[in-house]
Amino acid sequence: MSTAKSDIKKVTTHQLQEMKNRGEKISMLTAYDYSMAKILDAAGVDVILVGDSASNVMAGHETTLPITLDQMIYHASSVIRAINRALVVVDLPFGSYQGNSSEALRSAIRIMKESGAHAVKMEGGIEIKESVLCIISAGIPVMGHLGLMPQSIYKFGTYVVRAREEEEANKLIADAKILEESGCFGLVLEKIPASLSKTVTHQLQIPTIGIGAGPDVDGQVLVTHDLLGINNEFHPRFLRTYANLQATISTAVTSYIDDVKSKNFPNENECY
């Protein structure tokens, strides 16, 4: 017997906090379309991130900067239609919240109203405090993001591990506390030393989600296409691949082409 959609217990920000409190790890993956989101949700992932990484993964851009608010809303809407259980968090894209809390609020409201998302995610520390406060005051949950921040790639100049030096590490800890005090329900820590993420996780009450941040965080996130081995050109140290779908897809497509060329598809059982 199938479970009615209304009977499925949905993941909420409060449940993520409860998971941290009892020591249960949080699973988080990316999705940008209905089909992938449906698979991830049915598999039981706790959080689905509609990331601005869609700029790289779906559109082939070198950075996350080109993706627009309208495009993020399109991807988020597609994901939301597939979801029965998971919490869906959507990245506010570059240019939609930096430097102006009123603009940040308008962007967050558009995402929530037009896509049906459950929360938004923002990169930055003290510099986005006013925007975070403004968005949360409107009843919109916010997840923070510190460490390597892809929207600031031209500031950093490279995608190397962040906060190795004491000064930057201390700033990250301070920023994490500011985001928590501002009301963020969770925090992504990207590509920082494992010892630092452990310190941050122990000092915060809210859940931390790591990507390239070691094991001592409250949960982990990966880009689903990387986990599935769809893009075999990307091999960061932190990535564990669980499949080689690039090879699987290539083999399937090659077989299809061969069958078409050789007139083996369709056969009589595949005709009306």
Swiss-Prot record:
BP terms from Gene Ontology: pantothenate biosynthetic process
Residue sites binding 3-methyl-2-oxobutanoate per the record: 52-53, 91, 121
Cellular compartment(s): Cytoplasm
Cofactor field: Mg(2+)
Sorted UniProt keywords: Cytoplasm, Magnesium, Metal-binding, Pantothenate biosynthesis, Transferase
Cofactor note: Binds 1 Mg(2+) ion per subunit.
UniProt keyword annotation of Transferase present: yes
Name of the top EC class for this enzyme: transferase
Location of the active site: 190 (proton acceptor)
GO cellular component: cytoplasm
E.C. code: 2.1.2.11
Transmembrane segments: none
Cytoplasm is among the record's keywords: yes
GO molecular function: 3-methyl-2-oxobutanoate hydroxymethyltransferase activity; magnesium ion binding
InterPro entries named among the record's database cross-references: Pantoate_hydroxy_MeTrfase, Pyrv/PenolPyrv_kinase-like_dom, Pyrv_kinase-like_dom_sf
Catalytic activity of the protein: 3-methyl-2-oxobutanoate + (6R)-5,10-methylene-5,6,7,8-tetrahydrofolate + H2O = 2-dehydropantoate + (6S)-5,6,7,8-tetrahydrofolate
Binding site for Mg(2+): 52, 91, 123
Pathway(s) this gene product operates in, as recorded in its UniProt entry: Cofactor biosynthesis; (R)-pantothenate biosynthesis; (R)-pantoate from 3-methyl-2-oxobutanoate: step 1/2
Gene3D superfamilies: Phosphoenolpyruvate-binding domains
Role according to the record: Catalyzes the reversible reaction in which hydroxymethyl group from 5,10-methylenetetrahydrofolate is transferred onto alpha-ketoisovalerate to form ketopantoate.
Family affiliation: Belongs to the PanB family.
Self-association and partners: Homodecamer; pentamer of dimers.
Protein's name according to its UniProt entry: 3-methyl-2-oxobutanoate hydroxymethyltransferase
